[in-house]
């Protein structure tokens, strides 16, 4: 392999120029998530419809009903939980994690008086009637963020979104008569079926749309205005809460101004980050379109992205309350930021989590009795309030450790030591203090007496938890190693407790067929959460140079493959592709990504939780649940095909099949902050270092 070093970063625009144009066939009427997506990190727009009707579904990434939630209680101590688990007391655990309804609820005339949680709200829809014209197709240029709708008679409607102006624009050609209507969520059946019983009033209409006064949260507005231009009309759409009025002089902006903003924004985005070129058009689209969606929903000036980003349904509550799900889903949503080089996109998430520290510190005190810890439940709203109902998930401390690992990974990639000093290091130490408080001495080693392997056994106390879950062990080791590295980076001496945990806590729980989920629980059926293999990826804590360990890994992998995909959900498929690449099976990695595209995308390229098409998984009953974790994880998986780091060494093109005769990447980020270009042509590999980090570079092979 030839390695060449360049003195300065080179911005290679050829790859940007060839970015994928994604196409749609209309009608797209199954659900809004079949539509063409636009977002600015705050507002999301989905363009869908059929016949003579265009629907613009609008959502906001901060639109929460904050009432409710399940604060940690003194009864929910780790000691009490262990005692109930040992007695197999399912009723006791259910009672411990159920609470009375607080007084700020006050529904009227409904049975909604039981336990409840915060949830994200639908906003509304703008519809356009086309005066007899018919929608035929649509497309989106991922290089510029510009889209268009093509009518059956060949005329085109242009689409663009401006982050700078917080404005979506739709240019209608001269001679096409359109009628607009702005429909609030309260005009849909969800209002009379649910929202009115939860204390919501109907939205109040105004000249351009409506304003919706919420029970305890800030009001929200959706507006749409048609403005005549020389060559047609432009419809402008915006949302607003307490921001300044968006672009009051819309008539002077013109569609051209919005389109220019979009071109500039996406040019800068693509030049900042990684680009790839592969001969497989489906994999190329997964990367280009997925990275576009990642950049849209995680903008550095936007709101932290939850399961659906800002693309929320307009006529129903979003699945799982639209929560921040920290046992893998948020991590997958943000995973393209690292190898992709979009480090600033992580900051809204990190600022939000660090702002929760008083709550998380109180959780730790009640959970394990320490004052210097942090406990982040796996499901929370944007204030860090626990969204309850799943006790085994709530006590999953790997959620906290994984977020701490994300923070330090950002430091490694970006070199941002100030962030480490100002909050990340404290969060990492607090997470480790809780893990150590959970551990006990057992046969001369450290052991975690009770913990979950995520989503295994649901909430069945006889199945869902056990001693030394391999997932928890891997998360703890990742955190320890990150803490030691962080201390050295800051010129501090590593805590002896961390070193003791690294030495005496097992790396995984072993069984006859490889890694077990936890003690006494082998991997016996297909499952969506590959958590027992997390020591391979994402945590990279398994020493593959140890021959005995390598044999355990081989057995684990074979058992996992044998159990198959029958109970997989969409978000776990790209993770599986990375695991295939990790063990050196590139054809399996790529075919797994192609399977995700084939089975877990709807006809409008929407990333689904359940399989849309049959034959790959029996988890296929809910074909309209969109989540962004799968799409973002697919982007990350494509980059891991190009460069994959294992045990401190980076291997280039490890996940690329030999049938790919020409494959390349540009501006890819490594864990020390180095940026690299690479190409493989007929088996010959060339690597260029085009940017340099401040850490120790990984070994290259």
Whereabouts are the PLM-identified features?
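Sec-dependent N-terminal signal peptides
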Residues: 3-14
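Acidic/polar, glycine-enriched structural segments that form the non-catalytic walls/loops
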Residues: 18-323, 342-347, 353-362, 491, ...
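Active-site core of glycosidic bond-cleaving carbohydrate-active enzymes
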Residues: 53, 67, 73-75, 326-362, ...
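Catalytic cores of secreted or luminal carbohydrate-active enzymes
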Residues: 102-131, 625-671, 675
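Secretory-pathway/luminal and periplasmic proteins that interact with or process carbohydrate-rich
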Residues: 105, 294-303, 319-321, 345, ...
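A conserved hydrophobic secondary-structure block that centers on an alpha-helix together
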Residues: 152-167, 186, 404-434
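Short, well-ordered beta-strand segments enriched in hydrophobic/aromatic residues
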Residues: 167-174, 476, 676-679, 685-692
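The feature captures the catalytic groove of carbohydrate-active enzymes
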Residues: 309-323, 371-422, 436-499
